[in-house]
Each structure stands twice: as structure tokens, then as C-alpha cells.
From Swiss-Prot:
Organism: Agathobacter rectalis (strain ATCC 33656 / DSM 3377 / JCM 17463 / KCTC 5835 / VPI 0990)
Domain of life: Bacteria
Residues where ATP binds: 206-208, 216-221, 290-291, 334-337
Keyword field: Aminoacyl-tRNA synthetase, ATP-binding, Cytoplasm, Ligase, Nucleotide-binding, Protein biosynthesis
Biological process annotations from GO: glycyl-tRNA aminoacylation
UniProt-recorded name of the protein: Glycine--tRNA ligase
Reactions it catalyzes: tRNA(Gly) + glycine + ATP = glycyl-tRNA(Gly) + AMP + diphosphate
Assembly behavior: Homodimer.
ATP-binding listed as a keyword: yes
PANTHER family the record matches: DNA POLYMERASE SUBUNIT GAMMA-2, MITOCHONDRIAL (PTHR10745:SF8), GLYCYL-TRNA SYNTHETASE/DNA POLYMERASE SUBUNIT GAMMA-2 (PTHR10745)
Main function: Catalyzes the attachment of glycine to tRNA(Gly).
Length: 465
């Protein structure tokens, strides 16, 4: 079975995971809406992150910061001055592209192994490569580009009734800065001592020129970020700790070790704030792509905000009787990207037929904790609806369940397989007498008979991780 993005996207759209944005108006380039199943899957992923990184973690607390911030925030963070992409236009078809992405795609398509990441190249190095290899325009195939120029990725808007410079604000390009400006507030009210972390889940916006690959790269996206504050000199130890913690979280939810890799950034490609960065990458059908960036941001952010705001952001260590600016380890995960990774990892086409009767089952093997629908409740006949609905009402108090009484039982099982439902409960005519139901396991397709009054206990630990 060849796992392709086309197959996954087709099922995702057909079953209600993801729809094209603004579809009845012809859409808006690279915007996507999460459907009835997609929103459940994404919420489950966010809950799983929050559970392990915030709720169960003794070091960390959470916040939810505003998307719009004082513009001085972005002066201090460096985003207004240095947050840009290298762009070039094709003089023939007038399409605009990111120079680094043109080079990466060309190298991949032509089997060229790049010695270093293009992220660390200068504009001159990119131009030289494009000329040396006669890289064509991805749109028209010609070889006539403009010079490379930098394009700021921040979305600009205006606050108030007049659109002038003093009312300019920006949609945040990352959630991290809201955490940094609230460092002292959170430390004071939570009474946390170093080391401790502040986590946040929220929307960010980047005016990407070449988004693509379904929901992998979009202009509006959601992040799950942790800023972990530690004593200078202990940052390498904590960097390794969180790198392993993030990797283990993915494995615990069903990502296989051979589907991901850890890639350290070359010194030339490091972000301006980073002492060291490791990306956790996932092998999508279209190739390797970053899921998680774990960065040692040192004291860059707190130092810059202290300088620009004039506020003291140092931490007083009462055990050592000294003040210092904490270093920061940042594990930053894209919610949309990791949802796509879970979709890709879980998708399967299983040959369950015989030579005489071929049969292929499409199934999403989601970890039960992530599955959009936990239990499908299926009456064998509509004559049994009244009793089956009572079972549904009982289970749906605890789990997100789906009730389906249309079609043959075999087709209903297949529908639940195709949306990744881990368990199906079938209420049949025997249930009227023995007060039991048949529970079918999605992955093994095995069935067992369980008493209705024991269902809560049966499912109690099925969805833990």
C-alpha cells in the first residue's frame, strides 16, 4: 500500500476532518476549516499536550495571552527588523516564490544532496546556486528571476478608527512573546521558583509566500509552546531533557521511531535568538518536515524586553542570594502540523480479502486518546433503537460517541474504521435478553460480549496514555 497525500487529503475532506476554507466562494488560498471530526481530533491533540506538559508536569503552568500586543513587543523581539523570507519573482509569468524553497524542491527532485541547510545561506549563495544549476521557475519553467529581496512575514492591521502609523498593530507571528512579557506576572502569582515553565496554546499568523502541502504550512496556524526558564549554565541539561520529553510524547501517541528523526540546526541556520536548536521531523508522504523545534533561546528574549521596556525582568534566587536573567528552553510545536502527522501515521489500507473476493479496508489507527469518536453505538436493527439509544446516552456522558443505525452492520463498521473509531458497540436482539452488547476492536476486528452495566468499567482505561 502506497501512502500518498492525495489519498489522505481525499479521505480527510470526505469524512469531515478538514474542508477547504470559504469553499462556496471559491476558497481562499491555503486556508482550511476543521470539520466535525477534525475539530475533535485537534482538540484531543491539544488536550494531550496540555495534560503532559502542563497538568501533570510539576514544573509548568499555563497562560492564554492576547493575539494583539503593543508594537514595541515586536521591536524588542526582533520580528519587525529580522523576521523575513527571501523572495524572488519570475519575470516571465510574474509568480513570486521563496528562493530557499525553490532550491530545496529542485535539489530533492534532482537527487542533489545539499551539504548544509538552505536556511543558513546568504542571498548571494542562493542566487549562485540558482544560476549554476539553471533552476527553472516552478510555474512556467523559464529561467528569468529578479534579484532576491527580504519580505517581512508579519500581518499588519490597525487598531481604532483611523488607519495611520500610530494605530498600527500586528497579528502575532508566535505565541512565545506573550509568555515573555508576562514572565514576572506569572512567576509572582504562581509562586514558582526557577526552574519552571509557562505553556500556551494559541493562534499565530505568518504571511508566508509559499504555503502548501495541505495543512502543513498555512498563514494562520495554531501553536503549542512552552517557555522553560532555567538558571544560566543549566540550559544544556534542560535542552536535552525537553528534547527527549517531546520525542517520548510523540511515541506515546503512536508515532513510530522510524517515522521521525532529530535534526540539529547548523550554526549558519540558527535563528537570531538561538544558541542551539533541534528539530523533530516527521516523514510525511511528501518528505521530511519539521514538527517540533526545541531551541535554547538563552536570555535573549528577557534581555531584549528588559532593555526596550525599561522594566526589571531579572529573577532573584534566594538560595544563592543573586539576581540573573533566566535562560529559556523553548519546545515549540505546530498543532496543525502534528495533527497532520497523526493523520498520516494512522492512515492505512489493509488487504483483508481473499483471492476469490478481494477486499481492502481503509482505516485510521489513531491512538484511542486522540480518536475523534471514541465509541460507535450501532443497533443491529432499527427496531432496537430505543434500547440502543439508552446505551448511547450512558456512554456519551463520558465519551464522544456516534450513533449510527443506517446500512448493514458491516458497512457501518467500515465507516467507523475510516474515521478511526477504536471501538464499536453493537446492540442486537440477544441484548434484549442477556443485557449484553458486542464490543468490536478497530485494530484487531475481534469482538467480545460485555454486560451493559459493565461498559463503564470496561472502557475506563481504554483511552489513557
Amino acid at each position: 500500500m502506497e501512502k500518498t497525500m492525495d489519498k489522505i487529503v481525499q479521505v480527510a475532506k470526505a469524512r469531515g476532518f478538514v474542508y477547504p476554507g470559504s469553499e462556496i466562494y471559491g476558497g481562499l488560498a491555503n486556508t482550511w476549516d476543521y470539520g466535525n471530526l477534525g475539530v475533535e481530533l485537534k482538540n484531543n491533540v491539544k488536550r494531550a499536550w496540555w495534560k503532559k506538559f502542563i497538568q501533570e508536569n510539576p514544573y509548568n503552568v499555563g497562560v492564554d495571552c492576547a493575539i494583539l500586543m503593543n508594537p514595541q513587543t515586536w521591536v524588542a523581539s526582533g520580528h519587525l527588523g529580522g523576521f523575513s523570507d527571501p523572495l524572488m519573482d519570475c519575470k516571465e509569468c510574474h509568480e513570486r516564490f521563496r528562493a530557499d524553497k525553490i532550491i530545496e524542491d529542485f535539489a530533492q527532485d534532482n537527487g542533489i544532496e545539499l551539504e548544509t541547510s538552505v536556511d543558513g545561506w546568504t542571498n548571494e549563495q542562493m542566487v549562485d546556486f540558482i544560476k549554476e544549476h539553471n533552476v527553472p521557475c516552478p510555474s512556467c519553467g523559464k529561467h528569468n528571476f529578479t534579484d532576491i529581496r527580504q519580505f517581512n512575514l508579519m500581518f499588519k492591521t490597525f487598531q481604532g478608527v483611523t488607519e495611520d502609523a500610530k494605530n498600527t498593530v500586528y497579528l502575532r507571528p508566535e505565541t512565545a512573546q506573550g509568555i515573555f512579557v508576562n514572565f514576572k506576572n506569572v512567576q509572582r502569582t504562581s509562586r514558582k521558583k526557577i526552574p519552571f515553565g509557562i505553556g500556551q496554546v494559541g493562534k499565530s499568523f505568518r504571511n508566508e509566500i509559499t504555503p502548501g502541502n495541505f495543512t502543513f504550512r498555512t498563514r494562520e496556524f495554531e501553536q503549542m509552546e512552552l517557555e522553560f526558564f532555567c538558571e544560566p549554565g543549566t540550559d544544556l541539561e534542560w535542552f536535552k531533557y525537553w528534547r527527549g520529553f517531546c520525542r517520548d510524547w510523540l511515541i506515546s501517541l503512536g508515532i513510530k521511531e522510524d517515522e521521525m528523526r532529530l535534526r540539529d540546526h547548523d550554526p549558519a541556520e540558527l535563528a537570531f535568538y538561538s544558541k542551539g536548536t533541534t528539530d523533530i521531523e516527521f516523514l510525511f508522504p511528501f518528505g521530511w518536515g519539521e514538527l517540533w523545534g526545541i531551541a535554547d533561546r538563552t536570555d535573549y528574549d528577557l534581555g531584549r524586553h528588559q532593555e526596550v521596556s525599561g522594566q526589571d525582568l531579572t529573577y532573584f534566587d534566594d538560595q544563592k542570594n543573586e539576581k540573573y536573567l533566566p535562560y529559556v528552553i523553548e519546545p515549540s510545536l505546530g498543532a496543525d502540523r502534528v495533527v497532520l502527522a497523526f493523520l498520516c501515521a494512522a492512515y492505512d489500507e489493509e488487504d483483508i480479502g481473499t483471492p476469490e473476493k478481494p477486499d481492502v479496508r481503509t482505516v485510521f489507527h489513531f491512538h484511542p486518546a486522540l480518536a475523534p469518536v471514541k465509541i460507535g453505538v450501532l443497533p443491529l436493527s432499527k427496531k432496537l433503537n430505543e434500547s440502543a439509544e439508552k446505551v448511547f446516552a450512558q456512554l456519551s456522558k463520558t465519551y464522544n460517541c456516534e450513533y449510527d443505525d443506517r446500512g448493514t452492520i458491516g458497512k457501518r463498521y467500515r465507516r467507523q474504521d475510516e474515521i478511526g473509531t477504536p471501538f464499536c458497540v453493537t446492540y442486537d436482539f440477544d441484548s434484549e435478553e442477556d443485557h449484553c452488547v458486542t464490543v468490536r476492536d478497530r485494530d484487531t476486528m475481534e469482538q467480545e460480549r460485555i454486560a451493559i452495566d459493565e461498559l463503564d468499567a470496561y472502557f475506563a482505561k481504554k483511552f489513557e496514555f
